[in-house]
């Protein structure tokens, strides 16, 4: 008798999780470029879409953090590790791993050095090129915040400067070991935003 009751409770708990998941996903349906939505208790904005999915920026900082204590190279940075573990996990718990799309990041420096190459992220920071592309949709914020674009690279004897966005929206370079705001970008599956009529 006890075993059957436990099985029934487990089945009901599973069904409840599935219903919650489905309802959680529906809250994003029908959104389009320029719209905002809430995810991990933060406001996000849809900046664009392509064949891979929907490119979104977190409009609220996750707090102030250093990029890294020693180097401006994104692939080895502490901030990338934080976004790829803690924040990725939180996002996936809310919308499912199938809705968070990996995407290539171009680590070209502000002065045109390609030494750092590219990498693939699921949760990342905006690059300077992306910031320029979507600038008309990104309002000024009251604080400084990180981009993943280095000012230069090790081959120029510069492994500590990285680009940041000022409260006025201008681009500056700062030491990678100073704390600034963290506004991640992600590509989410376009199916998450499709209305039931699509």
Q: Which residues fall in each region the model found?
A:
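Collagenous Gly-X-Y triple-helix signature in extracellular proteins
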Residues: 10, 18-198
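Acidic, low-complexity intrinsically disordered segments
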Residues: 1-10
């Amino acid at each position: 008798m006890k075993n059957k009751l436990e099985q029934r409770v487990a089945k009901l708990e599973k069904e409840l999780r599935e219903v919650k998941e489905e309802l959680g996903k529906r809250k994003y349906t029908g959104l389009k470029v320029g719209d905002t939505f809430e995810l991990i208790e933060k406001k996000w904005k849809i900046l664009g879409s392509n064949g891979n999915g929907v490119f979104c920026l977190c409009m609220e900082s996750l707090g102030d953090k250093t990029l890294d204590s020693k180097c401006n190279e994104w692939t080895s940075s502490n901030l990338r590790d934080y976004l790829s573990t803690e924040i990725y996990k939180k996002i996936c718990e809310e919308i499912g791993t199938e809705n968070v799309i990996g995407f290539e990041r171009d680590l070209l420096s502000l002065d045109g050095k390609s030494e750092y190459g590219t990498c693939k992220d699921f949760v990342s920071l905006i690059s300077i090129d992306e910031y320029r592309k979507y600038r008309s949709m990104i309002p000024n914020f009251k604080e400084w915040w990180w981009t993943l674009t280095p000012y230069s690279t090790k081959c120029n004897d510069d492994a500590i400067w990285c680009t940041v966005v000022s409260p006025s929206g201008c681009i500056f370079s700062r030491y990678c070991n100073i704390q600034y705001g963290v506004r991640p970008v992600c590509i989410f599956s376009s199916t998450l935003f499709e209305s039931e009529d699509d």
